[in-house]
């Protein structure tokens, strides 16, 4: 097994970082370069990366602390917190150069295209950081504070931040996370046809996760997601408002 695959298979979320550590400049540059080198739709690169450190990173942590103390803690203690934005501002500039009126608010594909580009870029950054020995944790919950964070970071129309990535030096004394079992292939891998998952497969995985006994989980895997998707999530309202405000959803779609 080569080192790239080993790093990928050894992935575990890290929420406990050694506070006060900074990323060496060359490591941050390597992580960003790796992130940007990922493939993107038509090479459109429909994303932006906001690197937050120091006071700005602290401001983000302070903004969310009351409602999301766990996320605030890992952001505060991380060496850097990278915010990834779905971004069509450069495409808007392309329209300015070539002529024509930029408006994607009546289209559905741009959101999917940009979200895919963001996901690929983020995973490249995560893999690069882990290959350098750092811990990482994705943070989608910051979308629940989208209006405040957008104002803090001057995120303009035609851009929308989707997710954050905390990177830092792992605090091995406090870290309890282990390599988490994934769904069996029967649930989500198919060869020449769609996978044939079933209730028994998911019941077995539910028991696998019970046996794994992650401390932070209070529900079984099936119960957690049956509850989560039974109604709109807590950040649905903020996400909808930002999609509308930032030009991703038209009046007709509303």
Can you say where each PLM-predicted feature lies in the sequence?
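Acidic, surface-exposed loops and disordered segments
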Residues: 1-254
């Amino acid at each position: 097994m080569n080192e790239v695959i080993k790093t990928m298979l050894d992935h575990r979320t890290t929420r406990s970082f050694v506070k006060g550590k900074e990323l060496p400049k060359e490591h941050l540059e390597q992580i960003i370069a790796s992130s940007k080198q990922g493939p993107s739709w038509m090479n459109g690169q429909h994303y932006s990366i906001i690197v937050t450190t120091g006071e700005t990173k602290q401001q983000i942590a302070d903004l969310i602390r009351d409602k999301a103390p766990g996320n605030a803690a890992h952001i505060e203690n991380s060496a850097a917190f990278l915010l990834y934005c779905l971004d069509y501002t450069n495409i808007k500039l392309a329209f300015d150069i070539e002529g024509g009126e930029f408006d994607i608010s009546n289209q559905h594909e741009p959101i999917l295209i940009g979200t895919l580009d963001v996901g690929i870029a983020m995973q490249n950054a995560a893999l690069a950081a882990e290959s350098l020995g750092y811990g990482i944790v994705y943070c989608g919950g910051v979308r629940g504070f989208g209006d405040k964070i957008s104002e803090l970071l001057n995120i303009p129309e035609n851009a929308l931040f989707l997710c954050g990535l905390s990177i830092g030096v792992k605090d091995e004394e406090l870290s309890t996370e282990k390599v988490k079992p994934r769904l069996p292939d029967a649930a989500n891998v198919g060869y020449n046809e769609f996978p044939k998952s079933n209730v028994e497969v998911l019941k077995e995985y539910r028991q696998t996760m019970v046996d794994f006994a992650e401390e932070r989980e209070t529900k079984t895997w099936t119960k957690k997601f049956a509850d989560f998707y039974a109604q709109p999530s807590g950040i649905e309202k903020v996400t909808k408002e930002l999609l509308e405000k930032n030009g991703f959803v038209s009046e007709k779609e509303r």
